[in-house]
Amino acid sequence: MSFFGGNKKTPEQELKDSKRELSKGQREMDRELNRLKIVEQEYIGKIKQLAKAGRNDEAKRMANDLVKLRGQMERMRATKTTLSAVSTKTTTIKANQTMANAMASATKAMSTMNKQTDLVQLQKTMMEYEKQTQRVEMTEEMMQDMFEDDEVDEEADDILSKVVDEVCLDNYQKMPSVAQKDLPYSSKTSTFKTEDEELNKLLQSL
């Protein structure tokens, strides 16, 4: 509480007010420096006029005033530089304060979450998850092995079928040839030739 019953300003509000006052002071100094530059040019012009008129004593006094004026301008420039540095420092302090507040909020949130987390239950959940994952992997491996066995059996059946056909063809070719006239029907010769061609094609595909 302040002396007048108002609420006390927070550090953020005080920093904001300080920065506003510093900016106001810099603007006022800029205006004063611009005014003194005009006065400086007037002094230089008067000194030249007095020197041309031979009024050296007056020119000397005016030159002394010019030196003092320039000294005042230099001091104002130095003060302005200081104000600028203070303003920058204030901005840095405000940024650091904002970052500190954010870190404090994050720390508080993390602390709350840690308090609410049941480590024992979390460990049980992770163990159950790992167990179920292993079961799924084992099932996938078993299914893959079954598919591989089926493919192997199918390929073996194909090879065996081709070998049997080859043996049958070989035995057929070793049989003594029979004259056409000894066959009861001439259509049997055509049938044997067709089967012979199909067997040859099958053997070539092996």
Swiss-Prot record:
Residue ranges with Basic and acidic residues bias: 9-32
Major localization listed first in the record, in broad terms: membrane
InterPro entries per UniProt: Snf7_fam
Topological category with respect to the lipid bilayer: Peripheral membrane protein
UniProt cross-references to Pfam families, sorted A to Z: Snf7
GO cellular component, as recorded: ESCRT III complex; multivesicular body
Keyword annotations: Coiled coil, Endosome, Membrane, Protein transport, Transport
Coiled coil: 12-80, 114-148
Chain residue ranges for the region called Disordered: 1-32
The keyword Membrane is annotated on this UniProt entry: yes
Location relative to the cell: Endosome membrane
Annotated GO biological process: endosome transport via multivesicular body sorting pathway; late endosome to vacuole transport; protein transport
Self-association state and partner proteins as the record states: Probable core component of the endosomal sorting required for transport complex III (ESCRT-III). ESCRT-III components are thought to multimerize to form a flat lattice on the perimeter membrane of the endosome.
Task performed by this protein: Probable core component of the endosomal sorting required for transport complex III (ESCRT-III) which is involved in multivesicular bodies (MVBs) formation and sorting of endosomal cargo proteins into MVBs. MVBs contain intraluminal vesicles (ILVs) that are generated by invagination and scission from the limiting membrane of the endosome and are delivered to lysosomes enabling degradation of membrane proteins.
Family under the similarity heading: Belongs to the SNF7 family.
Listed name of the protein: Charged multivesicular body protein 2a homolog 1
The species this protein was found in: Dictyostelium discoideum (Social amoeba)
